[in-house]
Amino acid sequence: MVKVKVAINGYGTIGKRVADAIRLQPDMELIGVAKTSPNYEAFTAMRKGYKLYTTKENIQKFQNSGINVAGSIEDMIKDSDIIIDATPGGVGANYKKIYQEYGKKAIFQGGEKSDVADVSFSALCNYNDAINKNYIRVVSCNTTGILRVLCTINNFDKIEKVRGTIVRRAADPKEVKKGPINSIVADPARIPSHHAKDVLTVLKGIDIITSALVAPTTLMHLHTLFITTRNKVSKEDLLNILSNTPRILLLNTEKADAESTAEIMEIARDLGRYRNDVPETVIFEDSIYTNGNEIFLMYGVHQESIVVPENIDAIRASLNIMSRDESIRLTNETLKIGKGYLI
C-alpha cells in the first residue's frame, strides 16, 4: 500500500493529537511537524521521533536550544501530499498561499474563516461533499459537537428548528494566561453566536439560533439544544439512533452517579484513555426529553480532541481514498472511538 504523506503545520493542542492519530493509520505516513517556537512541545515531538521543521529564520534558534531540525516549513510542504494546518486561527489563511504555490492540498481548522476552503467539513454530515476537494475546513470543536447531534437526528426525521446554548470552557488546561477565572462571560452578548452561522456552512438551510457563554473551567464545553422535528419523535427512537451512531456516547447519569464534565473526564482517565481524550460527543441520557415533535438534550464536548477523527477523515475525503463509511470505520477502529455508552 502506498501511504499518503501527511505534514502537520502547527504542533499545539490539535496538531499534536492529529500527529499521533496519523501514526496509527495504515494508509498514512507522518513526514513531519512544524513549530515556530522551541518550547516543551517541540522537545516532546523530538522525543517521540517526529521530524521537526520550522521557519528558515528560526532554524538556528531551535538548534541552539538543542532541538534537531529537519529543515524549513517549505521543505516539509514540498515533501508532503497533504498538509494538516493546525496553526492559530487566522494564520492558516496566510499559509494557504504557500500550499497553493507548491500545489498541495490542505486541511484547515475551525479557527479559520469558512472562505479559506472549498468546503466546511463534518464527517457524519457531509463527507461526500469534500471528496477530491483541495482545501477543506474542519469546523470548530463546538460546531462539530452540534453537527454530530443534528445530522444524526436529521437523518431520522427532518429538523425544522434548533435553538441552543453553548457554555464554553474558558481555556484549555495548558493555557495559563487565559480566563476568566471568576466570572461567567456572555460570548457574545448579542444573538446569535457565530456557532449558528458555522453550522449553516455544513447543514445548509436549517433554522438555527445559538447563544454562547464562557465559564471558568478548562475541561469541556457543555451544550443544551432544543430541537423541533417535522414529525413526532419518541425518547426511545432517539436513544436507539444515538446509541447506534459512531462518535456519539450516552452517559446514564443515574446509573453512573455522574452528571458533570469533571466526571466525564475522570471516567476517561479511569478507562486509561490516551491523554484522557474523549473525541466522542457525550450526551447525558437523562437530559433527553421529548414532547411530540420537540426534543431537548444536553451533552459535553471535549474541545481538545473532538476534531481529531474529523481531520483524519478529511484527508481521505480530499484524496478520495475511501468511502465515507469505510473511512469513519477505520478511523474509529484505529483511534478506539466508540458508540453506545461511555460506561
UniProtKB/Swiss-Prot annotation:
State the reactions this protein catalyses: D-glyceraldehyde 3-phosphate + phosphate + NADP(+) = (2R)-3-phospho-glyceroyl phosphate + NADPH + H(+); D-glyceraldehyde 3-phosphate + phosphate + NAD(+) = (2R)-3-phospho-glyceroyl phosphate + NADH + H(+)
Top EC class for this record: oxidoreductase
Gene that produces this protein = gap
Q: What is this protein called?
A: Glyceraldehyde-3-phosphate dehydrogenase
> Which GO CC annotations does the UniProt entry carry?
cytoplasm
Question: Where does it localize?
Answer: Cytoplasm
Active site residues of this protein = C141
Q: Which residues bind D-glyceraldehyde 3-phosphate?
A: S140, C141, N142, H195, A196
Pfam families, alphabetically?
DapB_N (PF01113), Gp_dh_C (PF02800)
Annotated pathway, please? Carbohydrate degradation; glycolysis; pyruvate from D-glyceraldehyde 3-phosphate: step 1/5
The record's listing under NCBIfam families reads: GAPDH-II_archae, PRK04207.1
Q: Where does NAD(+) bind?
A: T13, I14, G111, R169, Q303
- Species of origin: Sulfolobus acidocaldarius (strain ATCC 33909 / DSM 639 / JCM 8929 / NBRC 15157 / NCIMB 11770)
- Give TM regions: none
Enzyme Commission number(s) of this protein: 1.2.1.59
